[in-house]
Amino acid sequence: MFHMLKIRLIPCIVTKGELVVQSFAFKNYLPIGNVKTAIDFFVNWDVDEIIVNDIDASKEFREPNVDLVSWAAKECFVPLTVGGGIKTLEHIRNLLKAGADKVTINTKAIDDPDFIKNAASVFGSQCITVSVDAIKQGNVYKLYDYRDGRVLDVDVVDWVRKVESYGAGEILLNSVDRDGSREGYDVELLKTVSGIVSIPVIALGGIGRFDQLAEGAIEGGCQALSAANIFQHMEHSTIAAKAQMRNAKLNVRLSSKVKYENFDLDFLGRPY
């Protein structure tokens, strides 16, 4: 299916409050700047969507930052997905009213899977993304709860089937093992999940070079490709990413203002 549809490029801005961080194995975090600056950077470049995910909101029992979303919606000319601290339907309503196009739910879905049903019923599946953090245990992938670093006794295969049946519109699939590793996506994980659900899967976790992106679609079967750390420390990063996706013959949305053939990569995977 991936080759028939345009493959989306979606930077993921990982935050602790309004501080953007780089994440490494879900354990170590490097602060790198302000979330408003990061959003400003991406809206001026070649992306299809933006995800802003506050990873501390649920841990710290904070509500979603509606004021930030309201500001971002005025700046953003691409769809905006927001996650972090979502516990009630009112939270979702407020975020959508503030200008978010979609929300991503993680720990609330773990605690109360029926919340997915209720949210999809009220707001529509197209607004509801479920974020799934997967970690490999032996030969199977288990669900990971980042709040306390627990590996849950829940098979990811069973979980994504349930998530889909409960009305999620898409899945944001993140590999705990690959997070910050720069080793590329966990293609086996992506292939496993995309092969058993019919809703779109967004690949996340492990990108260290832009020429690694395409395997998420070609081998992993995903309809959207996301990354976090790599976009935060090099100029023209999203254009270089699209250039590599184009070179891999993926069907991507291209800007008429950009000459993609000028974006080659050096031996470290950086554009030059």
Swiss-Prot record:
Catalysed reaction equations from the record: 5-[(5-phospho-1-deoxy-D-ribulos-1-ylimino)methylamino]-1-(5-phospho-beta-D-ribosyl)imidazole-4-carboxamide + L-glutamine = D-erythro-1-(imidazol-4-yl)glycerol 3-phosphate + 5-amino-1-(5-phospho-beta-D-ribosyl)imidazole-4-carboxamide + L-glutamate + H(+)
Q: What is its EC number?
A: 4.3.2.10
Q: Which GO terms describe its cellular component?
A: cytoplasm
Q: Which Pfam families match?
A: His_biosynth
Q: Which GO terms describe its molecular function?
A: imidazoleglycerol-phosphate synthase activity; oxo-acid-lyase activity
Gene Ontology biological-process annotations: L-histidine biosynthetic process
Q: Which Gene3D superfamilies match?
A: Aldolase class I
Q: How does it assemble?
A: Heterodimer of HisH and HisF.
- Protein role: IGPS catalyzes the conversion of PRFAR and glutamine to IGP, AICAR and glutamate. The HisF subunit catalyzes the cyclization activity that produces IGP and AICAR from PRFAR using the ammonia provided by the HisH subunit.
- What this protein is called in its record is Putative imidazole glycerol phosphate synthase subunit hisF2
Species this protein is from: Vibrio vulnificus (strain YJ016)
Fetch the PANTHER family from UniProt. Answer: IMIDAZOLE GLYCEROL PHOSPHATE SYNTHASE HISHF, IMIDAZOLE GLYCEROL PHOSPHATE SYNTHASE SUBUNIT HISF/H IGP SYNTHASE SUBUNIT HISF/H
* Subcellular location(s) of the protein: Cytoplasm
The protein's superkingdom reads Bacteria
Q: Which family does it belong to?
A: Belongs to the HisA/HisF family.
UniProt entry keywords in alphabetical sequence:
Amino-acid biosynthesis, Cytoplasm, Histidine biosynthesis, Lyase
Mind telling me which NCBIfam families this protein's record contains? Answer: WbuZ
* Pathway named in the protein's UniProt entry: Amino-acid biosynthesis; L-histidine biosynthesis; L-histidine from 5-phospho-alpha-D-ribose 1-diphosphate: step 5/9
